[in-house]
Amino acid sequence: MTSLSWITLLAFALSVAFCLGFRGLAREWHLIDIPDARKRHDGNVPLCGGIAIFLSFSAATFLAFGVSGHANAMALLPGLVLILVAGVLDDRFNLPVAPRLAIQLLAAFLIIAITGLTQTYLGLASDGIETAAASTPEMLIQVLTGPLFLIIALAFIVGLVNAVNMSDGVDGLAGSASAAAFFWLAVIGFGIGEHRLGLQALALAAACLGFLVFNMRHRWRARASLFLGDGGSTFLGAALAGFILILASGTAAVAFPVLIWIVIVPVIDTLSLIVRRMSVRRSPFSPDRQHLHHLLMDAGLSCGQTAVAVMALNLLAGAIAYIAIRFDIPVWPMLLALAVPAAAHTLFVLRMTRGARPIVTASMAEANPTTKPNITYPGATS
């Protein structure tokens, strides 16, 4: 059996085993999701999926490579641990937004510092530029370095952490979408010769699939028996951001704007939500039911169909990134083409929300008891 096969199978098997083992412990630790006005699921569901995915990925990686795996990917672990712990604490104690963001920023800084990332490849240079001009505006758009790189990298990590977290609202959605993204990161890693990084990304995809045995709705499972929790969704977002930044650096770097395609679905949905919430003077982190998955369910899809649809969109977006890399499509067209999914998302949101009554949050409903909240949807898990 090849290393590719056994590492993938090991990560999957460990994930299933850890999910089974931690379900009882999660109840003892009070890591459970209790149904309320916003969460419409049956019974108290353990929030230990993220812990299981992290442990299975880490164990499979160390058993396969020891400490000789891809140096930057191994260096992600301290920051990922901090993100995971902060998310688990949020699951347990419902932390305020400010300390959550502070911990996420610290974890993002650890990821950048320990991996030694100092630049990201943009690939936006024009052909035919004279060498003498390469030290001024050319270098600015070809390779991003210095304080500007640090600011953008921090924003990217924290942004993707929260984008994946916000997308975790339907059984199987965040896990399957993340598995699709890690799959394409693995394929791209193998394609540019980063085999250890590719194996580690594939191990994470397999660990997500092991979790989906308990979280994805299918013929033999009517509803999820295990949730990712904030610890899991934020960990997956940080891991995706870290792998993308690693692939966008080094001697065989892939252009960052091309890699963005792999996570474009949660990125566009989150940016759209932030703009819409702030336009009505609401916090970007306030809950509502205006996410893409909510609107897909409003359009008539079931919970399971919604998860599959979003996963398919992620697979398609990742395939576009791979095709661009495989056939050396210039970066500028790929960057400009990001307007297509953004426009499609905007048109879909406008169509689904046209004529809809204003969204009412739980806090607004408490302030005015005569107002009926409009924040839930059958089948949504968070």
Enumerate the language-model features and the residues they cover.
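"…together with the soluble PPM/PP2C metallo-phosphatase catalytic core" -> "…together
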Residues: 1-268
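C-terminal membrane-associated helical module and adjoining short loops/tails
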Residues: 246-382
